[in-house]
A protein has these predicted regions:
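Positively charged n-region of N-terminal signal peptides that target proteins for export
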Residues: 1-5
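C-terminal segment of classical bacterial N-terminal signal peptides
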Residues: 14-22
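Short amphipathic alpha-helix with an adjacent loop that forms part of the alpha/beta core around
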Residues: 47-51, 75, 166
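Cleaved targeting-peptide boundary
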Residues: 24-30
């Protein structure tokens, strides 16, 4: 029948594109709460009655995709609810029934876009935890004013334009306000004078001046925010850590005013010039991620100890510049492209931790020169993943080295990695090698080695040298071409796991 294929195709399409049936209502106890989806029906009421006595912290209910009648029914039946979570309830239009729950201590509301009036929460003065994330909330926060016992505050709305109404909470240490566009930060500062940690993620902030009055502020996050000028924060005496990840700003140079800051965590911005870091005497941790920086020389004039370069939008260039950072202790190269002169890192005399992760010059370019390690007399751990390397045989006797991990090394070049140099490290206790072709393991012996992990490793001809390691207690091998005979003759205390 010539129409059979067409008929079958139409039937298949009908099945694929037919509207899916709504999920059936459900209710069950999960951990420390009762979860209810789709409806508060008689079954849900029965489940709560049967399970509530088993909840050690009182009745806590999680609601998903319920309507006004459902919320009213629940609150009428159980006025002793201690905690409530309301999520994904697009049909819900009113929170009025919550006003009856006088024993509530925790409220978590999100995705209730049809709810615009949050005043029913005003009478819940026993609340200690409040989380409201919904764009249905607009204007100010005056409905919050009576809630003076809060210990956790997390508020989010794209339509929030004023922080007026935040209750007086002098003992509150941490608070989060997201997506808001407040014209004035003064109400926040006045009500929460002793904050040590503040998240203003995705907010639009024209003037940061009021934040300088937060005398105890230690951490500040502007993740995804729009910030006109960072310099007012120079007057915040205890500010040590600042997150400006994905911030929109035309004035990153104003970060140079923050002489007191010790940690700057950024990325995914339009940052191209970091000359301002040279003026930050207390800066210890600095990250650059997916940015346009081409000149890293200002870092040589800093006291930065922890530095990460991650997936930059321009070639990284000469690593010898990084090698001139006098105080650098921890260096992480993450998805680095266009890097040259890795041997120039040999001058990092204070380096304690070195990591290459994900890839190194994957799109082409120089292999990483392991001759650089010879100058790292303080390094304790080395981890290299997804990089081609050269001069592995030049690895020196690193006196403080304790851990080495090699993963997917030389997969592009196909070259063998000579690991014998690591055996010269007198304190090496853990060696991990995954997905590599190696040489030098047959004579690998170091006095402090305790564990060795090998997975998908080729080139192993013998493990005889390991028998001379007095502290060795575990060998784990997976998918390696090693004969069983090579695993014989070890001390009884050595636990050998083979998969």
């Amino acid at each position: 029948m010539k129409f059979a294929p067409l008929v079958m195709s139409l039937l298949a399409a009908a099945i694929i594109y037919a509207p899916s049936a709504e999920a059936a209502p459900s209710a069950k106890r999960s951990g420390s709460s009762i979860q209810i989806k789709e409806a508060v029906d008689d079954n849900a009421i029965s489940v709560i009655k049967a399970e509530k006595a088993k909840l050690q912290k009182g009745l806590v209910v999680s609601l998903e995709k319920i309507g006004d009648a459902d919320l009213a029914k629940l609150c009428d039946a159980f006025p002793d609810i201690k905690g409530i979570s309301i999520r994904g309830n697009k049909e819900l239009t009113s929170l009025a029934p919550l006003a009856k729950l006088t024993q509530l201590t925790s409220v978590d509301i999100s995705e209730t876009v049809q709810v615009t009036d949050y005043s029913p929460l005003s009478s819940l003065t026993g609340l200690t935890d409040l989380k409201v994330r919904s764009d249905g909330m607009s204007g100010d926060l005056k409905w919050m004013t009576p809630l003076v016992n809060l210990k956790k505050v997390d508020i989010s709305s794209k339509n929030l334009t004023s922080f007026e109404g935040i209750p007086s909470l002098p003992s509150l240490k941490t608070a989060s306000f997201h997506y808001a566009s407040p014209a004035d930060l003064t109400p926040l500062v006045t009500s929460l004078p002793n904050l040590t940690s503040l998240h203003l993620n995705y907010c639009t902030l024209a003037d940061l001046t009021p934040l300088a009055k937060l005398a105890n502020l230690d951490f500040l996050s502007f993740y995804g925010a729009t910030v006109a000028d960072f310099s007012p924060l120079a007057q915040s005496p205890k500010l040590k850590r600042l997150n400006y990840y994905a911030v929109k700003s035309d004035n990153f140079a104003s970060l140079g005013a923050l002489k007191q800051v010790s940690e700057l965590d950024g990325g995914l911005t339009k940052l191209a010039d970091i000359s301002w870091v040279a003026g930050l005497p207390n800066l210890k941790t600095f990250d650059v991620f997916a940015e346009h920086v081409t000149d890293y020389s200002p870092l040589t004039k800093t006291n930065v100890e922890n530095f990460t370069i991650w997936n930059m939008r321009t070639p990284v260039g000469d690593l010898g510049v990084i090698g001139q950072m006098p105080m650098l202790k921890k260096l992480k190269l993450w998805s680095v492209e266009g890097a040259t002169n890795s041997a120039g890192l040999a001058s990092l005399a204070n380096l304690e931790s070195f990591t290459i992760t994900t890839d190194f010059n994957k799109k082409g370019g120089e292999a990483f020169d392991l001759a650089a390690t010879a100058g790292w007399n303080k390094v304790r751990d080395i981890s290299i993943e997804g990089a081609d390397v050269i001069n592995a045989d030049k690895i020196g006797a690193l006196p403080e080295l304790m851990q080495v991990k090699l993963s997917k090394v030389n997969q592009r070049s196909g070259a063998t990695v000579d690991v014998s140099g690591f055996a010269k490290a007198p304190k090496l206790s853990l060696l991990t090698i995954y997905d590599c072709t190696v040489s030098g393991l047959e004579s690998f012996a170091t006095p402090k080695l305790r564990r060795i992990n090998l997975r998908n490793v080729k080139g192993i001809t013998s493990l005889e040298g390991l028998k001379a390691c007095p502290d060795l207690y575990q060998i784990e091998i997976q998918n390696c071409d090693i004969p069983d005979s090579a695993l014989q003759g070890f001390s009884d205390k050595v636990k050998i796991k083979r998969k």
